[in-house]
Amino acid sequence: MRIVKDIIWTWFLPDNERSINRKLWFDHGGKWLIFARKKKIMEFAHQLEPFIDSGDIESAKCWNGDPSAINIYSLDCNREKVKKILEKSGAKKRSVWEYDYAWKKNLRNPIDFLYSWASKFMTILKSYGIIGAFHLFKEAMKAD
């Protein structure tokens, strides 16, 4: 597993690059989100290494702040298989599924969607505070 870090995220990628069908990903690609302290997230991420390298999990990324969150990517057809891997790997906290690009599908489960976005917002604020969050967003906009 390769680890790549930028200003906001640490990516956990397979050792060997895999091609991605963009159309398939836009329609069916998503992620499991888990929120916890940074130390727990990093320990958990390293437990996913064999599953990322084997292709059972496409990839993962975690928020660099503390508290943190990890996104574990897969196609929706593998969603339940990946959830079982996460549970066996120690994901004790509530996890939530969210589509990456198929936003209309996210709205089919409004409670999960609201939980996901509220948790993301709180994680950013707890990690950086209000002023720090604004600076982070400003820097992130420069990076693209």
Predicted regions and their residues:
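Structured alpha/beta or helical-core interaction and ligand-binding surfaces enriched in interleaved
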Residues: 1-144
